[in-house]
Amino acid sequence: MILLTRNRIAKHTIVTLLLGIAVSQNSQACRKPPAEQMVTPDQQIALATDVSVARVIRATPSTLPALGGRPSVEYEFEVQQHLLGFPQSRFILVGAQGETRPGPSSSDHSDGKFWERGGGRLYNDPDCVLRPDFIVGEHYLIFRGKPATWRSFEHIETVRGRPNPNDRWLSFVKEKLQDR
């Protein structure tokens, strides 16, 4: 009788552990980002439909529910340079509060990892969705539309109130879009 009870407890413990492992794997960080986020710079340019250099002029907490565990924020942008797509002077993107960008190893996108497949300075929320954060007053090279990648919302350093003209990513995108 005692042996039977111990076996039941052991089975129950094993089942509980396995269930816990299965559930916890789904609640962990994004282990395998979607394939469409893992592109090369050339692939990103080929897929682009709307590209602008824009400055963040407003960040407003959104009434949308918090997704990915972080509160939603509406960011309003003023277009500084329109590079591709339908020209607009302003647009709004919904992102999230809290940092989603690791510190850059270079301020002008000259670091090698940025240029690799899947490179960029943005990372996913635990549900594998990109919800970028932005800083009011700063410039960004924005690729709007699908697919959003880790390079779709890159900060471009501000030099004397303007986007850095020597930024490698910005220069690359401008050159490639002229050739399209």
Give, region by region, the residue ranges found by the protein language model.
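Generic detector of low-complexity/intrinsically disordered segments
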Residues: 5-6, 19-21, 179
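Bacterial N-terminal signal peptides that target proteins for export
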Residues: 2-14
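Bacterial N-terminal signal peptides
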Residues: 12-22
